[in-house]
């Protein structure tokens, strides 16, 4: 079997590192062909030393220059590229077999679309591609013959729980025709699911980034605490699985053992379970339709004391309700919400605003954006930019 060339968009981030771990566990199957990052020279340098990719790219031009000099000094032949255009070209490289799209935020949008338009097999971990570009993105997947495989643990669990016919029609699967009645999205509820609401004003960034089950970056940890993460996943799930609002259900499951479920019309519920480790869904997408070793501890059922399920309280999680409503309002609203949330979360991490202010900034930003029908990527980027400016203005008010 010929080794698969993997391009990792966001190799220095949490998902990127987990992807490299799966590659390391399967050196006979996969090669880290190209590694892409932002400006973290040291992390990228270490990855290049260890995995010897053909290419390494950094968005920051100065950082790329430093990386190039360091690699030359150590006689590492990796070719270093810089800037967004080079990253988009790597995402569409003719020698690339699979693209791990895991750059966080709107920055990951163009490279991911570039991979789709090149007809690549895209392992999707970048939420923004669907949150901001849902219809455009799904249409591009179909028009360019790209293969989309969801990496997010919840969407991957849903994917694994669907019939093969649905797996082959991501974005266009007719759920009701295949006997599916509901998609159940599970979430841990974050670290504050039992915290009294009156204490929410005192929540610190340190408390918010300490996720009880998953190892994640700061931004996504805060999103998990506010359940914006689940809101974004709700939006993604509706696009990925062609699901109506009536075909969606969101449940809090504190143990994060069941990663999501699918209800069928005959009363069956099919679920995917496992230890909360992102290497499982990463390995599943890389090897699909086969399986490969991920290096994950097997689930020990005797250590699971209980599995509990709680209905989400929108007073506790206003961002979740906001995301559900934003999808109903249209693509402009989900794009604006996502952009505002990036600004608001960073402001919270920088101690400029309180924990409860994140949802307020997001909601007010959507209110101030004029309803607009998105027709192309430029429209998306325009609304994204507008929403960021509005959110920054709200921070100053």
Curated annotation (Swiss-Prot):
Pathway(s) of this molecule: Isoprenoid biosynthesis; isopentenyl diphosphate biosynthesis via DXP pathway; isopentenyl diphosphate from 1-deoxy-D-xylulose 5-phosphate: step 1/6
Binding locations of NADPH: 12-15, 38-40, 126, 128, 217
Reactions listed under catalytic activity: 2-C-methyl-D-erythritol 4-phosphate + NADP(+) = 1-deoxy-D-xylulose 5-phosphate + NADPH + H(+)
Record-level GO BP terms: isopentenyl diphosphate biosynthetic process, methylerythritol 4-phosphate pathway involved in terpenoid biosynthetic process
Catalytic activity, EC: 1.1.1.267
Binding site for Mn(2+): 152, 154, 233
InterPro entries in alphabetical order: DXP_reductoisomerase (IPR003821), DXP_reductoisomerase_C (IPR013644), DXP_reductoisomerase_N (IPR013512), DXPR_C (IPR026877), DXPR_C_sf (IPR036169), NAD(P)-bd_dom_sf (IPR036291)
Residues noted as binding 1-deoxy-D-xylulose 5-phosphate in the record, renumbered to the chain: 127, 153-154, 188, 211, 224, 229-230, 233
Domain of life: Bacteria
Cofactor: Mg(2+); Mn(2+)
Keyword NADP: yes
Any single Pfam family the record assigns to this protein: DXPR_C
Family stated for the protein in its record: Belongs to the DXR family.
NCBIfam families (UniProt xref): Dxr (TIGR00243), PRK05447.1-1 (NF003938), PRK12464.1 (NF009114)
Role description: Catalyzes the NADPH-dependent rearrangement and reduction of 1-deoxy-D-xylulose-5-phosphate (DXP) to 2-C-methyl-D-erythritol 4-phosphate (MEP).
Protein name, UniProt field: 1-deoxy-D-xylulose 5-phosphate reductoisomerase
Species this protein is from: Haemophilus influenzae (strain ATCC 51907 / DSM 11121 / KW20 / Rd)
Lineage: Bacteria, Pseudomonadati, Pseudomonadota, Gammaproteobacteria, Pasteurellales
């Amino acid at each position: 079997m010929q080794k698969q060339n993997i391009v990792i968009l966001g190799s220095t981030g949490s998902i990127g590192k987990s992807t490299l771990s799966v590659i390391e566990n399967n050196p006979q199957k996969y090669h880290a062909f190209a590694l892409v990052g932002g400006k973290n020279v040291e992390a990228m340098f270490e990855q290049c030393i260890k995995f010897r990719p053909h290419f390494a790219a950094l968005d920051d031009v100065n950082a790329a220059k430093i990386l190039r000099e360091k690699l030359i000094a150590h006689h590492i032949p990796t070719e270093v590229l810089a800037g967004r255009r080079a990253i988009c070209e790597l995402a569409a490289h003719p020698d690339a077999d699979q693209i791990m799209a895991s750059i966080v935020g709107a920055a990951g949008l163009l490279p991911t679309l570039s991979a789709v338009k090149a007809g690549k097999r895209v392992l999707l971990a970048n939420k923004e591609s669907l949150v901001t570009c849902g219809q455009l993105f799904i249409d591009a997947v179909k028009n360019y013959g790209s293969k989309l495989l969801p990496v997010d643990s919840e969407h991957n669990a849903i994917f694994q729980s669907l019939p093969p016919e649905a797996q082959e029609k991501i974005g266009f699967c007719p759920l009701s025709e295949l006997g599916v009645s509901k998609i159940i999205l599970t979430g841990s509820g974050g670290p504050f699911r039992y915290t009294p609401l009156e204490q929410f004003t005192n929540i610190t960034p340190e408390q918010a980034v300490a996720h009880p089950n998953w190892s994640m970056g700061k931004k996504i940890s805060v999103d998990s605490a506010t359940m914006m993460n689940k809101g974004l996943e709700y939006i993604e799930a509706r696009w990925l699985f062609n699901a109506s609002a009536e075909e969606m259900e969101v449940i809090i499951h504190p143990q994060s053992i069941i990663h999501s479920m699918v209800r069928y019309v005959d009363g069956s519920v099919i679920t995917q379970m496992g230890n909360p480790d992102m290497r499982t869904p990463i390995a599943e997408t890389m090897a699909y339709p086969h399986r490969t070793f991920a290096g994950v501890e097997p689930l020990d059922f005797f250590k699971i004391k209980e599995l509990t399920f709680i209905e989400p309280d929108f007073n506790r999680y206003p961002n979740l309700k906001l995301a559900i409503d934003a999808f109903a309002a249209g693509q402009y609203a989900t794009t604006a919400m996502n952009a505002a949330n990036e600004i608001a979360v960073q402001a919270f991490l920088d101690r400029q605003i309180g924990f409860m202010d994140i949802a307020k900034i997001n909601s007010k930003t959507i209110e101030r954006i004029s309803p607009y029908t998105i027709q192309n990527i430029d429209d998306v980027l325009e609304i994204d930019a507008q929403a960021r400016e509005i959110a920054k203005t709200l921070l100053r008010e």
